[in-house]
């Protein structure tokens, strides 16, 4: 670096090319700095030398006016080469444009790119001032007693985090802190999760399993996502393989089954919490081993008495094998079976019913067929729709026909999948499985989807009720409904209708299955597709076991909206008058079908003959139509609710006023996160909240006051963001600046209909001048919202608001617009003398 020969020089450099497009000031600035001179970026009072060449005329004039030395670039070069401070008078600057007329102002534009200099407080004055201001503010916040300002952090993923350090309202904040601390301390008293319930079930499997599902909240049970994973997973994953099943898997699968049942029939669950059937209570009290042995004895006795056929030991062994197969496959303990009896009163214990079905099949089929069936069921849990039973087969039904274990939607789809087509085609019932007394039946090969459709299309519904006595099954998306019958020997059997639906079934699929059920009902030969399952006989004297259900059935009737004229509908064919009386006496109602309890008078008036009993009841096809209508009525509100929730926008709007753009962006993000509001530019009928960045009396604030809205500060949004929900508005209301806001809001909440203030109700008719400010429309809206009357013409008005240029009357008051604005702000009519306009 050269010697500081120009240390006393403060220079301002303005060196341009002759055509005014190139700026060469930087080169000479560097040379001057090297020689110890101080170079100023602006032409201020400290400047002593101006290095000038083809610069601005204003710079030349200013230098001459101040008496600053004007030198050329040659002076700088001479000083550098000589190494000394040369006399400025030897190298005066020349202004070539001084004597030219300035008719056209030539705009200089440097074509050279500017060097990017990172702004720091040292090289940028504005940045330095801003930095000093922030430092002072930070120091003030540290020393003040109120604490610091809230901090907003924007993370890399775009999420917004609020870290408040200031207490808006100390009492409000402390109460909130105490509440959060209390919730943390009481966390162990919250509802147990499903995993905790499974752990509890290990300690006390007989009691806790019955109680744990009932402790779950109703909302959790009935949500569409609660147990979707359990329903759609395979049975092997839930229950394990047949060889290695431990107690934990048994309990897990059983609990999932119980939960799904509770979700399925939520209407009945409410009543089941207070009512329980005595018949199921006595089943629950008995031990599991005794219960199973009783079932086997009852079945053997029934087969001996009714069919006249003694069961051989081989058949007993086959029945035992089928029971073991079912236990290994489904992992349902007898205790859990009786538990289901408590949870769903209108549903038999499924494990026992399906075991009985297995026993009945096993007594007439060889072990090879059972092995095949075991393999096929491992792939498809859905029970096959067996082809027609004979008249004699119905006589084997010792109790009400009951539906088999219902499975999830995935099982239903799996049955019709191409993977199982081969198995279903090869699955034949052997001739030995048919009873000797049964008449000719269909081929027992399972039908494919195309064959089923073709048979449904050719079906003749005229033969309904003529010949068959089998119990038909109506499928509502894997719902199998069976209506029990009372046998001819006069045993007092409690009849029960079973509805078991899967947890989540699409309404469209349900309606489609309802239509398929209507087609599937009958066939040209008069034999319907049916599935007859034997059920354990309840002891005599239990005819009244269904009385707790009657109240529940009335609730279900109201929910489905079915008419009393449909009470005669039934899902089973009536064989004789005794069966018809038993059917009408005990026939229950269930969701998705139109069966209603027949009154005692109708039961007594039923004819004794079979033909009369059939005449009094509608055909099967009519019942199916009514069932479909009832099911449509049931699912229609849920569909409409989902659509309305999906397409519905928030009805409340939020308006921002006097808000900087940074805060507006924050509010938009918070509203998008917490929902519940839509942002509007101006106050309208749906506006409930007005957010003001500064306590200024804007038009939106006045309209918000007139409409009874919350007028809040920006901090309400920040605190709501911190707590994750919209909090109470009262601590953040700007009532000090706008005293009318809480008063109008209270009046709005107390008003029955649409709110309209009474501030100007006693004032005469007003006319708003077109030249008024705020605009006429907004001012008229304010007057109208506060109960005033506005005229379109001045001759009908006694008060004129705003500047009026027409002929003035002595009887009319000419007031300023501030009279309206101040009256609304203070919530009282201000004295008009202070707002009179000059005549």
Curated annotation (Swiss-Prot):
Chloroplast found in the keyword field: no
Source organism: Pongo pygmaeus
Record PROSITE patterns: BRCT
Pfam families: Microcephalin, PTCB-BRCT
Start and end residues of each stretch annotated as Disordered: 337-376, 417-442, 564-586
Compositional bias per record (Polar residues), positions renumbered to this chain: 564-581
Cellular localization per UniProt: Cytoplasm, Cytoskeleton, Microtubule organizing center, Centrosome
Name of the protein described by the UniProt record: Microcephalin
Gene Ontology annotations of biological process type: cerebral cortex development; mitotic cell cycle
Keyword Phosphoprotein found: yes
CDD domains cross-referenced by the UniProt entry: BRCT_microcephalin_rpt1 (cd17716), BRCT_microcephalin_rpt2 (cd17736), BRCT_microcephalin_rpt3 (cd17751)
Entry text on domains: BRCT domain 1 is required to prevent abnormal chromosome condensation. It binds directly to the SWI-SNF chromatin remodeling complex.
Phosphothreonine PTM sites in chain numbering: 335
UniProt cross-references to SUPFAM superfamilies, sorted A to Z: BRCT domain
Keywords (A to Z) from UniProt: Cytoplasm, Cytoskeleton, Phosphoprotein, Repeat
